[in-house]
């Protein structure tokens, strides 16, 4: 693979690929994402993040070594494998947020870890996490936060539902209580203990406060129609 280096990244990509064509644009985009994540989390890696930009999900599995097709994932401490082609461009905030936030801690709940990554993403399929959460509440497909904090429950549902909910919840938590308290909470390995110690509430209470907040917003009719189409494809 060819290689391109920027201030905080090493990008590996195939010759004549879409990634090679766009490598300067990709580099500038990731550097901007990196700066924002570091500013919010108040931490900066001492290493460069190394991207492997692959043409297909199958190539991701082959280069990583497990032969499992995948669009993108972070391999700690500093590697990210991602598909980048004409149809799929798995770059942006998400995997970088994992790599950088794990320098603080890796809480024992996948919901919290993915929630922080989705907080930076803001959107799922181009639609705001908050709108998706309202849509799920209105259509009785919403899953309560206290349930999602359990990995067994979290993985039993499709990420189409769980990721936007946790992204919106994380956004609400940070906006309501501030980033400093959130970072204190993120340092707890046991998230149930962290919620009680930092926020002085139980997850069920926070969930109800969050749902009440989401219900303050009306979803635009055209956006809701688009969500219906995407969700049932």
Region annotations inferred by a language model:
Residues 60, 66-70, 80, 87, ...:
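Acidic/His/Gly-enriched intrinsically disordered linker/tail segments
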Residues 1-104, 109, 193-194:
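Juxtacatalytic substrate-recognition/specificity segment
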């Amino acid at each position: 693979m060819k290689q391109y280096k920027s201030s905080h990244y090493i990008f590996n990509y195939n010759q004549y690929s879409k990634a090679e064509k766009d490598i300067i644009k990709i580099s500038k985009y990731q550097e901007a994402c990196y700066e924002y994540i570091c500013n919010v989390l108040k931490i900066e890696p001492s290493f460069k993040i190394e991207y492997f930009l692959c043409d297909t999900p199958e190539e991701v599995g082959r280069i990583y070594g497990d032969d499992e097709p995948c669009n993108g994932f972070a391999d700690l401490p500093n590697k990210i494998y991602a598909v980048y082609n004409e149809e799929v461009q798995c770059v942006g905030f998400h995997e970088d947020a994992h790599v950088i936030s794990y320098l603080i801690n890796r809480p024992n709940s996948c919901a919290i870890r993915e929630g922080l990554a989705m907080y930076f993403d803001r959107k799922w399929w181009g639609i705001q996490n908050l709108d998706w959460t309202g849509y799920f509440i209105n259509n009785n497909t919403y899953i309560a936060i206290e349930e999602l904090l359990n990995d067994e429950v979290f993985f039993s549902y499709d990420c189409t539902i769980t990721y936007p909910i946790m992204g919106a919840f994380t956004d609400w938590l940070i906006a309501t209580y501030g980033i400093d308290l959130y970072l204190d909470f993120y340092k707890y390995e046991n998230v149930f203990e962290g919620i009680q110690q930092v926020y002085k509430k139980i997850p069920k209470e926070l969930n109800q406060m969050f749902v009440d907040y989401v219900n303050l917003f009306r979803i635009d009719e055209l956006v809701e129609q688009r969500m219906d189409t995407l969700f049932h494809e």
